[in-house]
């Protein structure tokens, strides 16, 4: 007699077969354009790449065709992940690996990409079907499972390390578009162990803010270096969920965060512009904070600490480049009249008005110092027995 796990596996296989048969039927009904072997800059209505190739003509990107040589893994095909996958597909990425265990629901329709008739299908298969119709030149690989389980995590690590555009090579980038901290920590652990560069993204529970973050193992802070409170406190986030209560979701915020993420991906892969290490988005004030976070030497992830040690060794071995200071150009070489600028404050007065410089961490300076209090400045006028009239008479004589 078959076990429960075997039955579940068989059900999953049958569901995937049903999805594939529906896709074949749908593909036959729809007219999918033939594959394009080489990107062209020719401006004609039938060329889907003409406006992308215009970036090369305008001097933004040197070699846009290079995008076809990259493989990107997208983990989480929800509000942010599905739009991210769509944008990368339209940009002509070489290969997309999609990971998600969830199914399309009518509750997802407030977000972008998915359509009502896809309800009940797995998100990865529904996404692959739609994306292949958009751009058949892109190679797709889908995995319908939860990466946080032991067996699936092992398979996930195997695919991101061997599922590149050329089989056996690693992917070029992993994009985290998941909506829970457990999955983020799983991706973080895998990338630290493999030394894989990845980008993390997220939208707040109230749907009016979000962020993207580039994580380079050993060089920048990983997700475990500065974890959210729910992770640092070892709280099981499943206990925080309540029946009948869900997080808010806006397609506008999802679209903005997905756009910022893909823009950063393109800049990183194609080498143009400035790649953001961390970029936040606050929709209430239209505020976009940007920063870079250093790796935590006391990080709980041992693979992160190992990557930090390897990065420090590489930096120490790298030859230091001498910085040549340019001499300031003299505006007026001749000073016929011998004019000089003289300060109104002497050096002694300046020292008296300044205080000691405090001991501060490296990189921090003070704008000014506070002078020490003079012990004699607190002296008061001696008391006198003279009357007010006598004092006024003395002042008149002065």
UniProtKB/Swiss-Prot annotation:
Pfam families: ThiF (PF00899). E1-like enzyme which specifically catalyzes the first step in ufmylation. Activates ufm1 by first adenylating its C-terminal glycine residue with ATP, and thereafter linking this residue to the side chain of a cysteine residue in E1, yielding a ufm1-E1 thioester and free AMP. Activates ufm1 via a trans-binding mechanism, in which ufm1 interacts with distinct sites in both subunits of the uba5 homodimer. Trans-binding also promotes stabilization of the uba5 homodimer, and enhances ATP-binding. Transfer of ufm1 from uba5 to the E2-like enzyme UFC1 also takes place using a trans mechanism. It comes from the Eukaryota. GO terms for molecular function: ATP binding; protein homodimerization activity; UFM1 activating enzyme activity; zinc ion binding. It is found in: Cytoplasm; Nucleus; Endoplasmic reticulum membrane; Golgi apparatus. The UFC1-binding sequence (UFC) motif mediates interaction with UFC1. Zn(2+) binds at residues 222, 225, 299, 304. It comes from Danio rerio (Zebrafish). This is Ubiquitin-like modifier-activating enzyme 5. A motif (UFC1-binding sequence (UFC)) lies at residues 383-398. Keywords: ATP-binding, Cytoplasm, Endoplasmic reticulum, Golgi apparatus, Membrane, Metal-binding, Nucleotide-binding, Nucleus, Ubl conjugation pathway, Zinc. Disruption phenotype: Morpholino knockdown results in seizure-like behavior and decreases locomotor function. The active site is at 246 (glycyl thioester intermediate). PANTHER family: UBIQUITIN-ACTIVATING ENZYME E1, UBIQUITIN-LIKE MODIFIER-ACTIVATING ENZYME 5.
């Amino acid at each position: 007699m078959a076990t429960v796990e075997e039955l579940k596996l068989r059900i999953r296989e049958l569901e995937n077969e049903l999805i594939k048969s529906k896709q074949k039927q749908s593909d036959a009904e729809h007219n999918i354009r033939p594959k394009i072997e080489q990107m062209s800059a020719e401006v004609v209505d039938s060329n889907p790449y003409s406006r992308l190739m215009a970036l090369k003509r305008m001097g933004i990107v040197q070699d846009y065709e290079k995008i076809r040589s990259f493989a990107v893994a997208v983990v989480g095909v929800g509000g942010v992940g599905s739009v991210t996958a769509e944008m990368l597909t339209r940009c002509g990425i070489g290969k997309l690996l999609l990971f998600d265990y969830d199914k399309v629901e009518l509750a997802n329709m407030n977000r972008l990409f998915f359509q009502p008739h896809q309800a009940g299908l797995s998100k990865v298969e529904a996404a692959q079907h739609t994306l292949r119709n958009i751009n058949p030149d892109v190679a797709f690989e889908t995995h319908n499972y939860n990466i946080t389980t032991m067996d699936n995590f092992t398979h996930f690590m195997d695919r991101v390390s061997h599922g590149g555009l050329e089989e056996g090579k690693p992917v070029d980038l992993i994009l985290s578009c998941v909506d829970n901290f457990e999955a983020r920590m799983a991706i973080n652990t895998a990338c630290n162990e493999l030394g894989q560069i990845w980008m993390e993204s997220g939208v707040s529970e109230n749907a009016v803010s979000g962020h993207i973050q580039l994580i380079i193992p050993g060089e920048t802070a990983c997700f475990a270096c500065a974890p959210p409170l729910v992770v640092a406190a070892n709280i099981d986030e499943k206990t925080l969920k309540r029946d009948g209560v869900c997080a808010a979701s806006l397609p506008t915020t999802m679209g903005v965060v997905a756009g910022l993420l893909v823009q950063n991906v393109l800049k990183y892969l194609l080498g143009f512009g400035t790649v953001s290490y961390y970029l936040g988005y606050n929709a209430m004030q239209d505020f976009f904070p940007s920063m870079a976070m250093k790796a935590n030497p006391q990080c709980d992830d041992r693979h992160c600490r190992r990557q930090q040690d390897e990065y420090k060794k590489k930096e120490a071995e790298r030859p230091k480049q001498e910085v040549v200071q340019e001499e300031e150009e003299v505006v007026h070489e001749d000073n016929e009249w011998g004019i000089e600028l003289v300060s109104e404050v002497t050096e002694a007065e300046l020292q008296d008005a300044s205080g000691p410089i405090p001991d501060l961490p490296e990189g921090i300076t003070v704008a000014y110092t506070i002078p020490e209090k003079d012990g004699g400045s607190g002296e008061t006028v001696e008391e006198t027995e003279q009357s007010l009239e006598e004092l006024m008479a003395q002042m008149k004589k002065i």
